[in-house]
């Protein structure tokens, strides 16, 4: 089962986790690949530079009343308080999320914009294709994307369990491995 509902009450999350003992369940408040890659990149940047000020700006259509589930997902992933989320409501914006890292003399901005709702369909297709390869359990998009992004974080699936990669994904993985090597040197590793 793949769910992209923005927010569940805690009681329903507990129920999904209980059901996951008998089936495979993936829940993500935002199922797009881009937003989930951005979250992984943001977690990496926060790990490298934990001293930065971090703010989240989310933009949606004029009539959306609540803070987006995606902004809350980003906030939780980065272990930030809800006060770090700023909301803008205007026109027919499908969804824009920006994570701003404030360094003393510069900023780094990671931004994702959904320009078509097809992005959600592509993400759902990827989620289903990856989920069927897993054991019964409760999964996130981060866990499905982890093998394609960075394999040094213990909460992600081991690289040995990663699915076979297409040429494009192999190129992306090589770039990521190069980035990981650079990070390891930066952090004093091998």
For the regions a protein language model found, what residue spans apply to each?
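Rossmann-fold NAD(P)-binding glycine/threonine-rich loop
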Residues: 5-25, 36, 44
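Short, ordered loop/turn segments at secondary-structure junctions
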Residues: 5-8, 30-32, 59-61
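Glycine/charged-rich beta-loop-alpha catalytic/anionic-binding loops adjacent to active sites
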Residues: 18-27, 103-110
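Rossmann-like NAD(P)H-binding beta-loop-alpha module
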Residues: 37-51
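C-terminal substrate-binding/catalytic lobe of Rossmann-fold NAD(P)-dependent oxidoreductases
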Residues: 50-159
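Long, low-complexity, intrinsically disordered segments
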Residues: 168-190
